[in-house]
Amino acid sequence: GSGLVGSEMCIRDSGSGVYISIGMGKDVLAKVDGQKTYTMDAAVLMSDARSQYEEMFTSSIWSQQIDGKTFEEYVKDQIRVKLIRVRCMNAMAKEKGIVLGREEKDGVKKAAEKYYNALTEEQRSRYNITEDKLNQMFTEFAIAQKLYNDQTSLMDIEISADDSRVINIQYIVTDSKDEIEKAYAELKEGNSFFAIAKKYNSDGEYEYELRRGEMDSKFEEAAYALSTGEMSSIVEAEGKYYIIRCTSDNDKAKTEVNKSAILADKKLAAFNEKFEEYEAGKYVEWNDSEWEKLSVSSAVIYNVKFEDTFNTITIN
C-alpha cells in the first residue's frame, strides 16, 4: 500500500493547470485529455472519509481548524487534489502504454460488483452510480497504482540502518531540575528504574518504543546514544527533565517494518515531486458549481468502503 488510495496520501496542490469550466454536465467533475471524473467518484471518496474520520474523532472534527481552514475544507481539498492526481496519472499511463492485465481486470470487475451490490437503489440514483462507472473508477485507481509502482520501482533510495532503528526505552520525567536530580540520586543508591519512574512520572507511563523524528532532538540524541541496558545522565528537552534507560537498542522486527515505512514515504515524496511538473503542464477542466454542492460532513455513508474494496485487487 503506497498510500495512493488511503487518506494519508498527502499531496501538495500546485494548482497551476486547473481551469474552472462551465457546461460540463451535472455528473462530471473534471476533464483531462477528454477523460472524465464523475461526481460519483467524489461521493465515493467522501463516504470513506466521513465514516473514517467520524469513527476516529466523532462528527465534531469537521469544524476544528487546521492551517487556517476547517478540517472539513481541508479534507475536501485533499479529495479534490487526489481526484485530479488520479486523472492526470491515467493520462501519463496512457502515454506510457500502462494497462491492466487480465487478472487485474478480473479483480477490478469483482471489486466494482461488490461495491455496487452494497448500495441501495436510492444511493445509486442520487449520484448516478452505475456498475460501469464504478468499474471505470476502480480501473483508474488501479492504473494509477500500477503507474506509481512502475515509476518508483526504479528509484534508488538509500536508508541507513541507524535512521530506521527502532529502540525500546524507559524514562523518568519531571518538570523541575530539583526533582530529576533527586530521582538521579535515588537511582545511584541502587533503587530500581521502574520504582523511581513510578514515583516521579505523573501519568504513570514510563516505557516507549522510539523512532527517529518523534521526539525533541536532544531527547532523541541521548536515547539513540545508549546501548541495551545503559542509562543516560539528566537530559533537558522542551522544558522537561528526563533520565532515559535503553532496554533494547534495536528491536529488529520493528526496525524492518519502520524501514519499509520510511522507504514508502520517501518514494511517495520523490514521485510527487516528479509528477507535479507533469501535472502542472496538463489542462484540467474543473466543474466548480458541481463541486460546491458536495460536502464531506453530510456525505452519504455507504455500507461499503472504497479503500477496503480496492485493496482486494492484486496489482502486479
Description of each model-found segment:
Residues 1-6, 10-11:
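Single conserved hydrophobic/aromatic residue that forms the stacking wall/gate
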Residues 7-8, 15-25, 32, 123-175, ...:
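PPIase-associated folding chaperone regions across multiple families
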Residues 21-129:
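N-terminal targeting/tethering segments
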Residues 37-41, 185, 244:
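Short amphipathic beta-strand/extended segments with alternating polar/hydrophobic composition
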Residues 70-87, 99-106, 133-142, 174-178, ...:
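Soluble non-cytosolic domains of exported or imported proteins
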Residues 96-104, 195-197, 233-235:
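Surface-exposed patches in mature extracellular/periplasmic domains of secreted proteins
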Residues 182-220, 252-254:
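Peptidyl-prolyl cis-trans isomerase
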